[in-house]
């Protein structure tokens, strides 16, 4: 199963689940799981100290996949840097394709970056749900899929050219031999201009992004926020404490919405209309269901998503 992760000519270090994890996974998949857990409790006295073992198989698999995908991000960015510095390796197919795509461009080739759920999960010490990567355009995302995702990955296109706000992208499902129940979602997205800030982020903790690996010792110091009003140190603190702030319409971490006496659409620029933004409400409730605490105060505006009767 280890061969599932990367190309033979580009080896990347991988972790191996413990024997206990393999046993638990086998029993979960092919045997009477309830009886097995009952027997463990009966003979061992408790299953509390085996809590990580139960999820270890999935955790190790997800982190092995992340290591390969993030390696691809660093590989892509290194090619961009080499082209920008006129240090071009003509034997590298990815470099040649990137150079051809940006031929005639007077500006430096922008780096790609990982953002959203993945960065938040790494900082908070939790297992990620998906990996989001931002590109200059759809052609760059296609080059990444072609040259940075191992050929032996079963890469299924779930949704082509989806759109959220000013962001477009492709939703891929990565499947692996021996890990059929643990599919990984990979979102390759773009704004057609790297100078445009994506507006499909709704929580401060999801605004973090980085261009380097989460295993790099400089990862934490490399983190930045997509939005200038969000303070990275405060975001990291919120992540470690499992707290979050719902960003207002201007992408600012406003805790308390101003409450004027006259309710006007023009006045309530901070409020998010729950009737128009049902997907934000869904994501908000999903965060809370996972144990994250919202730091925003209730809003008195009847149609605001933070109106207390709507979310409590």
Swiss-Prot record:
This is Uncharacterized protein R69. Belongs to the mimivirus R69 family. It comes from Acanthamoeba polyphaga mimivirus (APMV). InterPro entries: DUF5769. It holds the Pfam family DUF5769.
